């Protein structure tokens, strides 16, 4: 059975589809699910669910495939899944969020969902946020899985993908799944904080209160007139979190707080910089550790390169110094997409980019250097009995202290027993993680008593930063970008430096001098957030 795409003008009764009383005629209008979300909580349960039986109906519309991925992989299928879910007080929590799949291209993600009784019915309906995530890249295709439960019986499932943060592959997909479930007698006692009801405020309040131009914070649909390429944007001001609804091609995403966001190169600042700062609290010399701690990087050209040089993108090794030449080179594409094992990745990273200058002087952006950094951090902590995997042994305990979500506690890794975390890309977040990271980073920014490596990254200046893009006054230091603005534009005596994280396709997470933080996730290669800078200054001056 094939389906058409486009929001229904008259919403179909999904319950008829879920219980096999009629076929699905077209895609789901997400806005039609809003009334269900406000219904009473469904009964508690603990199930294992799967889709290992036949697919009853399927439709896909691929409207962007830059690299012709459909030629090499079958995109006309749904990844098989099997996972345990627990429903308590209407909140549905998966035991594991990341599900490995036999699909050639995707793994499967499931987030925290809801369980609500249908009006005047004996069954409840479950909506789970799901995503297809690329096995060897950071793209995310977001959607929902919806099904009903009556006593211990499960209905069909409807899986729909209607949005993504992915610059080179975009599609709409819908499938009716023949679902199975198995009752687990005892409820899973593991509990997680719910992010579903975290309070989010509208940008409209800010615009009205401070007479700010609508659209200044890149919220939909103002972002350069094209909302299709913006996943989400937000402004964080202490306990206040302003954001937009999560736009999709099928209406607003019904569980916006649980929408999965890819880190791309935000991981360089999180997995790279924060990890070094945490280790440095105990071992001050980590930043000066030679890259030769790594067996594959013991060539004479690497001897004087330190872990800090790698974090600065200043190893002195490169093909050409032209911005993004190395990052977009064929050999680096092979490192990212074709090298699947650690041995393959580290071989390319250490031996494909010749020494051109002494380390510490010249900025040349290349993700493979951050992969070397992650490998070096692992070797450093092994020698000091701190563990053997920095992501699991250093970073995840830190995430737990901040009460970040389970979504951020995962990284893409090499396909071998080494299972090396990619470090420079391959993490995931939800909106609440951004708020908690903002609170932490803004505190470190103004406090120089600890985490000095991170504090320096958040306080850029001419002395500690290398020029990255001279024409745009953009600099780089310790895994963070920064942009210098003329102080007179804000009535400030000195220039204003704004540190930020940046990710492939159009992702920014910036930290303003007035203790506000701003973010947007998009995939149209737009890196422009000056309006947000001036609007934030209008709310609370930078100096």
Give the role of each language-model region.
Residues 13-37, 41, 45, 281-318, ...:
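Active-site helix/loop module of the DD-peptidase/beta-lactamase fold
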Residues 175-227:
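Low-complexity, highly charged intrinsically disordered N-terminal segments
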Residues 208-233, 300-404, 429-435, 439-443:
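Active-site-adjacent helix/loop patches that line small-molecule binding or acyl-intermediate pockets
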Residues 210-255, 508-511, 517:
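A short, well-structured edge-of-sheet supersecondary motif
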Residues 262-286, 310, 373-377, 434-441:
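Active-site SXXK
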Residues 327-337, 412-428, 476-477, 481-485:
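Carbohydrate-binding/catalytic loop surfaces
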Residues 405-413, 459-522, 527:
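Active-site Gly/Thr loop motif
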């Amino acid at each position: 059975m094939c389906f058409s795409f486009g929001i229904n003008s008259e919403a179909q009764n999904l319950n008829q589809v879920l219980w096999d009383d009629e076929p699905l005629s077209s895609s789901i209008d997400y806005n039609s699910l809003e009334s269900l979300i406000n219904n009473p909580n469904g009964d508690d349960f603990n199930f294992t669910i799967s889709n290992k039986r036949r697919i009853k109906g399927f439709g896909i519309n691929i409207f962007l495939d830059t690299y012709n991925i459909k030629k090499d992989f079958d995109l006309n299928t749904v990844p098989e899944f099997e996972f345990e879910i627990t429903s308590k007080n209407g909140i549905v929590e998966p035991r594991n969020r990341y599900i490995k799949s036999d699909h050639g291209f995707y793994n499967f993600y499931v987030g925290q969902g809801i369980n609500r009784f249908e009006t005047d019915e004996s069954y409840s309906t479950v909506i789970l946020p799901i995503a297809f995530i690329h096995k060897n890249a950071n793209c995310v295709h977001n959607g929902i899985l919806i099904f009903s439960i009556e006593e211990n019986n499960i209905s069909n499932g409807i899986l729909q993908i209607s949005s993504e943060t992915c610059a080179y592959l975009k599609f709409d997909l819908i499938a009716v799944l023949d679902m199975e479930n198995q009752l687990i007698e005892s409820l899973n006692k593991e509990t997680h904080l719910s992010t579903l009801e975290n309070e989010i405020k509208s940008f409209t309040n800010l615009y009205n209160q401070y007479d700010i131009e609508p659209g200044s914070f890149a919220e939909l649909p103002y972002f350069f007139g094209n909302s299709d390429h913006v996943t989400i944007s937000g402004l964080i001001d202490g306990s206040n979190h302003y954001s937009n609804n999560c736009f999709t091609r099928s209406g607003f995403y019904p569980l916006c707080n649980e929408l999965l966001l890819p880190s791309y190169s935000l991981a360089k600042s999180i997995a790279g910089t924060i990890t070094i700062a945490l280790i440095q609290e105990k071992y001050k010399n980590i930043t000066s550790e030679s890259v030769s701690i790594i067996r594959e990087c013991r060539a004479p050209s690497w001897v004087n390169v330190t872990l800090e040089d790698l974090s600065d993108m200043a190893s002195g090794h490169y093909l050409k110094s032209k911005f993004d030449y190395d990052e977009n080179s064929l050999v680096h594409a092979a490192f990212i997409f074709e090298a699947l094992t650690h041995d393959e990745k580290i071989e390319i990273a250490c031996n494909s980019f010749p020494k051109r200058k002494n380390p510490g002087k010249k900025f040349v952006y290349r993700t493979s250097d951050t992969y070397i950094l992650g490998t070096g951090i692992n070797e450093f902590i092994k020698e000091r009995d701190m563990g053997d995997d920095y992501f699991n042994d250093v970073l995840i305990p830190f995430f737990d202290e901040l009460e970040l979500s389970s979504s951020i506690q995962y990284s893409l890794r090499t396909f071998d027993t080494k299972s090396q975390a990619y470090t420079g890309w391959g993490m995931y977040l939800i909106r609440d993680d951004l708020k908690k990271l903002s609170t932490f980073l803004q505190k470190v920014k103004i406090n120089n008593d600890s985490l000095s490596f991170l504090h320096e990254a958040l306080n850029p200046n001419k002395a500690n930063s290398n020029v990255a893009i001279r024409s745009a006054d953009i600099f780089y230091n310790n895994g963070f970008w920064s942009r210098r603005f003329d102080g007179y534009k804000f009535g400030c005596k000195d220039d204003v430096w704004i540190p930020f994280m940046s990710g492939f396709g159009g992702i920014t997470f910036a930290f303003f001098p007035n203790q506000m933080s701003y973010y947007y996730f998009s995939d149209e290669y737009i890196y422009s957030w000056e309006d947000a800078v001036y609007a934030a200054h209008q709310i609370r001056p930078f100096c």
